Amino acid sequence: MSKSPLTLQMPSLPDPVPVVLNPATTALLIFDVIDHISARQPICKEKMVPAISQLLVRARKAGVTIAYGTRAANMSTWLPEVSPASGDIKIENHAQDRFYHTDLDNALKAKGITTLILTGWKVSGSVTYTSVGATLRGYTVVVPIDATLDATEYEIVIGQFQILHQNSSNATNEPLKTRASTLSRTDLITFK
């Protein structure tokens, strides 16, 4: 097989920004941090899981709504560091967009949630598609770049680029732009 002469240039991304979130109207969503994915993806367990775990502890302490999404067969295989607690929302999804054919939107709106923090595997898949579904439904979205990764640097950058440039584009990464997505980092997220 011959090599392609095509060389792709990575799109540039703005720096992650600090955000201050109201715990009463914010939900932390965690996608696919399960045994078989983590076993195949070292970056998942080594970098992403510790970031999610630390954010999850702070979110629980602040009273943030917590929701989990994965396929039905995987619901019992969450890594212990980020596993669901009693009362957390659990969505058995059928597609990358966690809103597609699920009751996630109803569950969040019943709790008065307006802002979502999207975390988990993977930024170019579930997180990107759910960010589109969320902004179409009127949510403001925060994506902490250390808490949602992918198999390659290319997929990470493309996922983040798509998140900022979908629907209500936020190409400059304006913090908490309404009905759009913001790139942040777990240490830049404050609950107040």
Where are the model-predicted features located?
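Active-site-adjacent betaalpha module
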Residues: 2-27, 54, 61, 73-192
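A short alpha/beta connector and helix-capping loop motif
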Residues: 24, 41-59, 63-72
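A cross-domain feature marking catalytic cores of carbohydrate-active enzymes
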Residues: 33, 68-71, 145
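Short acidic, Gly/Ser-rich segments with clustered Asp/Glu that frequently serve as metal-coordination loops
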Residues: 34-40
